[in-house]
Amino acid sequence: MPNLQTVAQLLALFVIITSGPAIIILIALRRGNL
């Protein structure tokens, strides 16, 4: 069974890759509103 820390790092990397563009768009919208 893989290490729990390794699984957590892979999951975090997956979340960053999949939600990266959405976070960038959200930041851009907030800066635009300000």
From Swiss-Prot:
Q: Which GO terms describe its biological process?
A: photosynthesis
Taxonomic lineage of the native organism: Eukaryota, Cryptophyceae, Pyrenomonadales, Geminigeraceae, Guillardia
Alphabetically sorted, this entry's keywords are: Chloroplast, Membrane, Photosynthesis, Photosystem II, Plastid, Thylakoid, Transmembrane, Transmembrane helix
The protein's superkingdom reads Eukaryota
Instruction: Spell out the protein name for this chain.
Output: Photosystem II reaction center protein Psb30
Subunit annotation: PSII is composed of 1 copy each of membrane proteins PsbA, PsbB, PsbC, PsbD, PsbE, PsbF, PsbH, PsbI, PsbJ, PsbK, PsbL, PsbM, PsbT, PsbX, PsbY, PsbZ, Psb30/Ycf12, peripheral proteins of the oxygen-evolving complex and a large number of cofactors. It forms dimeric complexes.
Which species is this UniProt entry from?
Guillardia theta
* InterPro entries noted in UniProt: PSII_Ycf12_core-subunit
**Subcellular localization:** Plastid, Chloroplast thylakoid membrane
